[in-house]
UniProtKB/Swiss-Prot annotation:
One GO process term, biological-process aspect: intracellular protein transport
Protein's recorded name: Protein transport protein sec24
InterPro entries: ADF-H/Gelsolin-like_dom_sf, Gelsolin-like_dom, Gelsolin-like_dom_sf, Sec23/24_helical_dom, Sec23/24_helical_dom_sf, Sec23/24_trunk_dom, Sec23_24_beta_S, SEC23_SEC24_subfamily
Subunit structure: The COPII coat is composed of at least 5 proteins: the sec23/24 complex, the sec13/31 complex, and the protein sar1. Golgi apparatus membrane; Peripheral membrane protein; Cytoplasmic side.
């Protein structure tokens, strides 16, 4: 049923009668013409109540200058322009919006002032605070300098506060001198999807870097998706790999050719090298090739197929060894049955192109249960179970049949998985010898290497690596809490290093409803290139829990991982890789070892400037040597070129706030684990103060200019991201956070790819009841679902009749206001009465109305990792939260509103005030 054009008759207490949305009842500041445009669509609309302002000041109004069209879903009265919540107008059309806040028209210094004023008058603002533009856009010269870098735009954080939409802008552009690359390819420099630098203009000296107080680090995410098909890059199959004789860098788009193209000069160390004879020969067509078309000279991201000399041993098969907890806890919560069924249903998805993939299974309670699975077509197709009770020195009964080839034993593996649950369905065994099982598994697969996948619902309580219940509620929130975040048993670190040396990687899937010591167990993935996946209070009896795990585990099994991998970063002479952060084992000063290379993690590398850089451009090259799932040795090379500068203003104007926040997220986790939570939080606050003070002293002329807080526009979100990090589950001060939840959060803070990490620190909130007409529908050009504009995470942005989606990438909350109108509840949930609305984990019903379909499309699109350019297996739970409903759930959802005051933490206004005082 379509609503009448003017919306429904106003409910008691919502809005006044009158011409709903007519130009006479305008919201101040929205031009009458804009009001008419809203109805010009001619489509009939639903309207879910609202004060009688036709357009406007709803959460979605001030962004990009588009008023929500039509009788929007409930709009709320104009926001008071309180300090700290004024909405800057980004690149808005001046005809549509009042020009109350013209961009960044605050005079900076006499030279810049005039230009900034002109930008403001033209409705333009900082070029990289505009909607995303192509990365390599030409930059027009602004001053007589060799190559003008990014312009510094000062803003006042108190009067022009951060807007969440800025987190969707690209980083400051990398401005290279013309002719830097050997061929003018648009793909010559590494896109930010794969590598981001905290500084897109690099100081030439250590002293300038030190003076800036900014970190110089790379955020490296070598893969943009779990599957090759979704992350197509140039592969060079001819095995002609030209490398510098001295520094071992790979040839790349930034080298220079000399001697009529017979030699090339390395852009890292300046050595002249010979071009290999086969470099200009097309081996497939057996004829000379055009060098200017070679992918390694045109693309910053390439993958070489490696010849024999890049192998320590022949490529090994892909091996998955499943260590499954079959104790009482794991049988009763349904983990055993669900994981067996999920492995069986995913057998076709496990990478097996070369038909060499091998699987093995060990069941674990107080004993170890090995399974010998015969080949398909054997006389006896039944799997045999062999039980070993000696946990100190677990031996391998018959190593031959314990790891079986998937292609040869497919049917019998299915038979075994069908029977596995029955074997243990009546167990009363509470023991869990997972440490001993890991040792046994290591013995089994260490000759070939591979993955050990642990599925457990219990604390390992006997055998090797036994742990005790050490969580103490009285310690939570005190300085002693930090000890609970450290490893309780040295076995987990020393064994992890052994695994790394034998090319064995460990992944943990943990499901306990009791304390499970994630802090200790997560060391195994941390040092072996694995990951810890945590499902607190999981129970297969809840369909949402079972489906979430099944979808994630199936994605995990299907992901194409690299094996026997090493990562190294090389750079221009004068730069040195200093510290590496992430899940791997640091084998030597500059080599990171990964028994398996995952596709859903990022790494941070800190760069030191050891000697003065004399070149106008520096290059940093990441290389990942690995074996693909189908047994091919390859090298993925990512080359990033950055301009250098001797000017502090350039360094600040080209700093990438999201890469900086990622670097400090890793630093904060390291600090929390070594010194404690309080020192980690204090270090973040001290850093925010230090950066603001440095900027004020060095670049804002030391003035306090009327009590403001000056910072460049491109870094305006940094103080907010620091506050959000301090308030994150992993770091925030609270006596209510179970240690396992905190440890799992710290794992995420130190492994998530940058786009997901930003969302985990500063979640996305979308206002759904008044979303623009195109939101939740496919974009005409791209076909992608359009999301509503995001809203800042403050309760001031939430109205009592609203419907909001809050999503941190791990969990989604659908917030239903206490005054939501019946029509909204009917359209979204299919319920006539608010009292029938059940809260908690659920999926929205699929109803036959366009608003329900659009809301579901927005929820699904918000979960879409591919559009963010990252790989991830996570499918967040959706929790429905009523504003006046279950208090625990409501408080949990409210912890996402990081700009509010909560528990023992300050609001954004208080935080900015305290920074202002300290600066």
């Amino acid at each position: 049923m379509a609503a009448p054009q003017g919306g429904y008759p106003p409910q008691e207490g919502y809005g006044q009668p009158g011409d709903y949305g007519s130009p006479t009842q305008q919201q101040p500041g929205v031009v009458a013409g804009a009001a008419h445009q809203g109805h010009a669509g001619g489509k009939k609309k639903r309207a879910y109540a609202g004060e009688a302002f036709g357009f406007g000041s709803g959460a979605n109004a001030a962004l990009g200058g588009q008023p929500p069209a039509g009788g929007s879903y409930g709009v709320y009265p104009p926001q008071p322009q309180a300090a700290g919540y004024q909405q800057p107008v980004y690149g808005a059309d001046p005809h549509q919006m009042n020009a109350a806040a013209p961009g960044y028209a605050t005079p900076a210094s006499p030279g810049v002032a005039q230009m900034t004023q002109q930008f403001g008058a033209m409705g333009m603002t900082d070029p990289h605070l505009m909607p995303p533009q192509p990365q390599q856009a030409a930059v027009t010269p602004q001053a007589p300098r060799p190559v003008p870098l990014n312009q510094l735009y000062p803003t006042d954080l108190l009067t022009q506060p951060f807007n969440v939409a800025e987190l969707d802008y690209p980083p400051p552009p990398i401005v290279l001198p013309p002719g830097t690359s050997v061929y003018p390819s648009p793909q010559a420099n590494c896109p930010p999807t794969y590598v981001r630098s905290t500084l897109n203009a690099v100081p030439t000296t250590h002293s300038l870097l030190k003076k800036s107080k900014l970190p110089f680090a790379l955020v490296i995410q070598p893969y943009a998706a779990l599957h090759d098909a979704e992350d197509p890059i140039q592969v060079i199959p001819d095995q002609v790999i030209s490398r510098c004789r001295r520094c071992r860098s790979y040839i790349n788009p930034f080298v220079t050719f000399m001697d009529h193209g017979h030699r090339w000069r390395c852009n890292m160390c300046n050595l002249t090298n010979d071009v290999p004879q086969a470099f200009d020969w097309d081996s497939a067509l057996q004829k000379p090739a055009d060098r200017s078309l070679r992918p390694d000279l045109n693309h910053a991201v390439v993958e070489f197929v490696a010849p024999q000399e890049y192998m320590v041993r022949p490529p090994q098969p892909l091996v998955y060894l499943f260590l499954i907890d079959v104790s009482y806890a794991s049988v009763t919560n349904g983990l055993l049955a669900t994981s067996a069924r999920c492995i069986k249903e995913s057998l076709d998805r496990i990478p097996n192109a070369d038909r060499r993939t091998r699987l093995g299974f060990i069941a674990v309670d107080s004993s170890l249960h090995y399974f010998s699975i015969p080949r398909d077509g054997s006389e006896n197709s039944d799997p045999r179970m062999l039980v070993v009770s000696d946990l100190e020195e677990p031996f391998l009964p018959i190593p031959g049949d314990l790891l079986v080839t998937l292609s040869e034993c497919r049917e019998n593996i299915e038979t075994f998985l069908d029977k596995l649950q029955e074997m243990f369905q009546n167990t009363q065994n509470n023991g869990c010898a997972m440490g001993s099982a890991l040792r046994a598994g290591y013995k089994l697969i260490s000759p070939v290497g591979g993955k050990m996948t642990v599925l457990s619902s219990s604390l390992p309580n006997i055998g090797h690596g036994a742990l005790t219940m050490r969580e103490d509620k009285k310690v939570l929130g005190t300085s002693k809490e930090s000890s609970l975040l450290q490893t309780a048993n040295s076995f987990y670190k020393s064994f992890a290093v052994e695994c790394s040396k034998a090319q064995v990687s460990v992944d943990m899937f943990l499901f306990s409803s009791q304390y499970q010591d994630v802090a200790s167990l997560s060391n195994l993935p941390r040092y072996t290139g694995g990951q810890t996946y945590f499902y607190p209070g999981w129970n297969a009896a809840r369909p949402e829990d079972a489906i979430k795990f099944a979808r994630e585990f199936s994605e995990y099994l299907s992901s194409e991982i690299g094996l026997e991998a090493v990562l190294r970063v090389r750079a221009t002479t004068g730069l040195r890789m200093n510290t590496f952060y992430g899940n791997f084992f640091n084998r030597s000063s500059d080599l990171c070892a990964f028994p398996a290379f995952p596709r859903d993690q990022a790494y941070v590398v800190e760069v030191a400037i050891d000697e003065t850089v004399t070149k106008p451009v520096v290059c940093l090259q990441t290389a990942v040597l690995h074996t693909t799932c189908n047994g091919e040795r390859r090298i993925r090379v990512l080359t990033l070129a950055l301009p250098t500068t001797q000017n502090l203003a350039d360094v600040y104007a080209s700093a990438d706030q999201q890469a900086i926040a990622t670097y400090f997220s890793h630093k904060a986790v390291e600090r929390a684990l070594s010194s404690g939570l309080e020192p980690a939080r204090e270090a973040l606050q001290a850093k925010a103060v230090e950066l603001l003070s440095t900027y004020r002293k060095e670049l804002a002329g030391g003035s306090v200019s009327g009590g403001g807080l000056q910072f460049p526009a491109n870094l305006r979100g940094l103080p907010v991201l620091f506050l959000a990090l301090i308030k994150n589950l992993g770091l925030r001060k609270s006596a209510q956070i179970p240690t396992d939840m905190r440890s799992a959060a710290l794992c995420l803070l130190s492994t998530l790819p940058l786009p997901l990490l930003m969302q985990y620190i500063y979640p996305k909130m979308y206002s759904l009841h008044d979303m623009p007409d195109n939101a939740g529908l496919p974009d005409e050009q791209t076909g992608e679902i359009v999301l509503p504009p995001p809203v800042n995470l403050s309760s001031e942005r939430i109205v009592p009749y609203g419907l909001y989606l809050i999503d941190d990438g791990q969990t989604q909350f659908l917030w239903v206001g206490r005054d939501a109108v019946p029509q909204l509840l009917l359209d979204v949930f299919g319920l006539a009465d608010r009292t029938q609305l059940r809260v908690g984990k659920q999926n929205l019903p699929e109803l036959d109305n366009d608003f329900n379909q659009r809301v579901r499309a927005v929820i699904e699109k918000s979960r879409d990792h591919r559009s963010k350019g990252v790989g991830s297996i996570v499918v967040p739970h959706l929790y429905v939260v009523k504003e006046d409903g279950e208090p625990g759930l409501r408080l949990w959802a409210q912890t996402m509103l990081v700009e509010d005051r909560a528990d023992q933490s300050v609001s954004l206004v208080q935080w900015m005030g305290s920074l202002r005082e300290k600066v």
